[in-house]
């Protein structure tokens, strides 16, 4: 069970974007793509068959999952634990003990 999932609100713990918050757009193995964080400029070649123009495009690049943490209700970074409730595994915030939606 992944502790961080698509749609979770996270904060960046390390790197050039430290302290920034965003929503997880995708989880790719041990990496996550966070909205508005770790944006790189990519040069795109024009493709007339697809109708795309060339130029410099902003692209979201993945971060390692260990460099982000979920945000609790107080706005602080929190680690995530796994708990069994009614025979199902649920994610629980370590700081507040709140159960996260599945």
Curated annotation (Swiss-Prot):
It holds the Pfam family ribosomal_L24. This is Large ribosomal subunit protein uL24. One of its GO terms (molecular function) is structural constituent of ribosome. It comes from Cupriavidus metallidurans (strain ATCC 43123 / DSM 2839 / NBRC 102507 / CH34). Keywords: Ribonucleoprotein, Ribosomal protein, RNA-binding, rRNA-binding. Belongs to the universal ribosomal protein uL24 family. InterPro entries: KOW, Rib_uL2_dom2, Ribosomal_uL24, Ribosomal_uL24_CS, Ribosomal_uL24_KOW, Translation_prot_SH3-like_sf. One of two assembly initiator proteins, it binds directly to the 5'-end of the 23S rRNA, where it nucleates assembly of the 50S subunit. One of the proteins that surrounds the polypeptide exit tunnel on the outside of the subunit. GO terms for biological process: translation. Part of the 50S ribosomal subunit. GO terms for cellular component: ribonucleoprotein complex; ribosome.
């Amino acid at each position: 069970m992944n502790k961080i999932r698509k749609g979770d609100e996270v904060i960046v713990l390390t790197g050039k974007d430290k302290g920034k918050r965003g929503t997880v757009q995708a989880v790719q193995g041990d990496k996550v793509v966070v909205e508005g964080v770790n944006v790189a400029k990519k040069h795109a070649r024009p493709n007339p068959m697809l109708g795309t123009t060339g130029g410099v495009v902003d692209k979201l690049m993945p971060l390692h999952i260990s460099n982000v943490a979920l945000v609790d209700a107080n706005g602080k970074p929190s680690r995530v634990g796994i708990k069994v409730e009614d025979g199902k595994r649920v994610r629980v915030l370590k700081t507040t003990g709140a159960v996260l939606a599945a």
